[in-house]
């Protein structure tokens, strides 16, 4: 039975590799493998398509590899260490998804792109430093990395993508660089361990559910650059007692009255004294009129 399972897994991996090379998700019968392999398009052989031995505990990616393909190491649940060479510039979607035992990874300075769900479900990861040349972090890139306690986001990033760090329950603090202009929906949703968030001075949009269920947050400062706050952006942050808008020159748009639902009963929203009346009367803000207080800088 074990031998049959091993053969089945092997054939599945071969099919996955062929489909990745072709860029086609159409199922491939095992009987067609010889024809499919012969007809594979020529191209860049520096792309690591798939790890055939899914039971490997360690792997060193060959020097000269420039891209780690989509799902290359997905579900390699026993993989504990990986060496990525300095030639790699791109980590594909789901490349290391659900590598539960992977405890650390060093992303080389050569990498510029981290694909969607690249490290999703890597519950053993405790810290990640994203290199300064990375300009794109995909959707759900680090989703459900529950063991992650620290993350360094470089200044090269301009947007925190949807669910990028969703359910990273071990994260205690995060600093969003000044070049970031948007925090997309559910970016830090359910990061229950977060106690400190620093939002950069270029952020204009805080998306839907961006910090929902961040139950460890007690206070947060929203920079004056923010013009829009989405649905349930801070909903169910049950210990949130202070939100500071004191550097704002205008009232930001609140997408819905639920933006701060189920926060602390003692929540105080600090705004510039000169804008208190306007703030209390603004659409959707009026729901929180009794929590809005004016402060002088």
Q: What role is predicted for each listed range?
A:
Residues 256-260, 277-289:
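Short, aromatic/basic amphipathic alpha-helical patches
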Residues 52-67, 77-90, 100-113, 123-136, ...:
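Structural signature of tandem-repeat unit edges
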